């Protein structure tokens, strides 16, 4: 689709990545004389995995082929910025929305040595790469501080110098000092929720600094059913600095730390405003465009 127009049906998924890339470069060229914002949400490596012919036999693993084509796409876009002399005045961010999907092993990828995958509150489902690139403005290096895609909102407002925008998100932190000066991350905590499996609005896990407590876990990939969810009367406690794979439950050894995380979460819960269930009959019955019927 392009806007509300169906441009191809059924779609040839083997050409999607290259077409997204070509369209992105076209938009960059059209807006090279003015500030622009371009968000590219590639389908790959989400299932089903289809790659274009040049990448179909790069590796034995289809997932690896998909990643290889994504890498090529990023390279084409970076080269376009360089050829247009926009690279030193453009901020490029590369990241992902979640960890691999282990329901579809082996084509879903792996988060090893982290535990879990997509839809899990464990690190394998949540920890993803985040690369910021802008020559002469962002210095080369790596940072291990805590950050979230939630922080992109306030960070982008700061990076673009948009002083006329007086809107900020309460759950977003400005990471620009981290990027420009190597400062410590202003984010020290993160709360984990499930968007569609009950209990909605409950905190599934919380991280504060190096410590993380799990109030709910699932013994099945995808939190596939309410029956797969286990509520822990005594939450699980992990030190992510020493144990990033969340293997050793330290709840009995550090009861005071666990209690502080419980109280921290309870206090946060009192400030929550739960949004309507996006799958409720009320939401689904709202008028939608013809193509979405």
What are these regions (language model features)?
Residues 1-11:
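Short glycine/proline- and acidic residue-enriched helix-loop micro-motifs
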Residues 4-6, 22-66, 101, 108, ...:
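Active-site His/acidic residue clusters
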Residues 25-29, 78, 82, 153-157, ...:
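Non-transmembrane alpha-helical segments in soluble domains
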Residues 31-38, 86-92, 127, 185-188, ...:
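Loop/turn elements at helix/coil->beta-strand transitions in domains of secreted/extracellular proteins
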Residues 35-41, 67, 74, 81, ...:
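Beta-strand elements within well-structured catalytic alpha/beta cores of enzymes
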Residues 39-48, 94-100, 171-172, 194-197, ...:
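Short, solvent-exposed turn/loop segments enriched in Gly/Ser/Thr/Pro and often Arg
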Residues 48-50, 60, 66, 79-137, ...:
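Histidine-centered active-site microenvironments of extracellular/periplasmic hydrolases
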Residues 100-112, 116-121, 138, 142-145, ...:
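C-terminal cap/loop subdomain of S1 sulfatases and analogous C-terminal strand-loop tails that border
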């Amino acid at each position: 689709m392009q806007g509300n127009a169906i441009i191809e049906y059924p779609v040839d998924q083997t050409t999607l990545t290259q077409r997204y890339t070509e369209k992105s470069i076209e938009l960059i060229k059209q807006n090279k004389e003015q500030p622009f914002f371009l968000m590219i949400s590639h389908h790959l490596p989400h299932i089903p995995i289809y790659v274009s012919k040049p990448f179909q036999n790069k590796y034995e693993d289809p997932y690896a082929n998909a990643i290889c084509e994504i890498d090529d796409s990023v390279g084409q876009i970076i080269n376009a910025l360089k050829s247009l002399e926009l690279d030193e005045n453009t901020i490029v961010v590369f990241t992902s929305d979640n960890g691999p999907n282990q329901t579809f092993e082996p084509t879903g990828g792996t988060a090893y040595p982290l535990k879990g995958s997509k839809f899990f509150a464990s690190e394998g489902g949540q920890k993803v790469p985040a690369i910021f690139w802008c020559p002469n403005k962002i210095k080369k290096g790596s940072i291990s501080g805590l950050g979230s895609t939630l922080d992109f909102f306030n960070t982008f407002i700061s990076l673009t110098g948009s002083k006329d925008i007086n809107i900020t998100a309460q759950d977003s932190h400005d990471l620009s000092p981290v990027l420009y000066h190597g400062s410590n991350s202003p984010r020290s905590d993160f709360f984990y929720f499930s968007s569609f499996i009950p209990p909605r609005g409950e905190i599934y896990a919380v991280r504060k600094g190096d410590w993380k407590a799990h109030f709910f876990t699932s013994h099945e990939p995808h939190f596939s059913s309410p029956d797969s969810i286990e509520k822990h009367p005594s939450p699980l406690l992990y030190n992510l600095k020493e144990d990033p794979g969340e293997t050793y439950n330290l709840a009995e050894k550090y009861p005071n730390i666990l209690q502080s995380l419980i109280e921290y979460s309870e206090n946060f819960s009192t400030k929550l405003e739960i949004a309507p269930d996006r799958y409720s009959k009320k939401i689904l019955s709202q008028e939608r465009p013809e193509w979405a019927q």
